[in-house]
Design a protein with these regions (language model features):
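N-terminal amphipathic/basic leader segments beginning at the initiator methionine
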Residues: 2-13
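Active-site beta->alpha loop and helix N-cap motifs at the rims of alpha/beta catalytic domains
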Residues: 3, 17, 23-142
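Hydrophobic pocket-lining residues within nucleotide cofactor-binding pockets
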Residues: 15-16, 149
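Conserved small/polar residues in nucleotide/adenosyl-binding loops
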Residues: 145-152
Length: 152
């Protein structure tokens, strides 16, 4: 099986200035990463602090990064949420921006069972067309998707 991604990827921060997204700083960040040889950019992953943004801002960050990186680096869009329907909605919106995949963090705070996590990711896979990068970060989410769960 051929890998979806090769090379180096950077999880981007989302710069803010006076409580608003600093689009010029984000543009400079994207350009500097691409100039440095990065082949993938992760937009609105946990490093980008999407939990501190509105969904409109979250989606706009992904759109902005995808537009700036077009044909120069692939973009992996952070679509994760506790709400499966929100993940599906976000993925179906950002696919039109030309992103390569979606980064989906395990649902946090609610502490799902493995069966619940499998149901979450299965529904996302069934209702979206973007490849899913399962993002396990148990120190933040208090849950972990075991590899065996993905065999189902």
């Amino acid at each position: 099986m051929k890998p979806l991604f090769t090379g180096t990827g950077t999880a981007l921060i989302t710069p803010f200035k006076n409580g608003e997204i600093d689009w010029d700083a984000l543009d400079n960040l994207v350009e500097s990463q691409i100039a440095g040889g990065v082949s993938a950019l992760i937009a609105a992953g946990t490093t980008g602090e999407p939990s501190t943004m509105t969904w409109d801002e979250h989606i706009e960050v992904i759109r902005f990064v995808a537009e700036r990186a077009k044909d120069r680096a692939c973009v992996i869009a952070g679509t994760g949420s506790n709400c499966t329907r929100e993940v599906i909605h976000a993925a179906n919106v950002v696919k039109d921006f030309g992103v390569a995949a979606q980064l989906v963090v395990t649902p946090y705070y609610n502490k799902s069972t493995q069966e619940g996590l499998v149901a979450h990711y299965t529904e996302i896979a069934e209702k979206t067309s973007l490849p899913i990068v399962v993002y396990n970060v148990p120190s933040r989410t208090v849950s972990y998707t075991h590899l065996r769960a993905h065999e189902t």
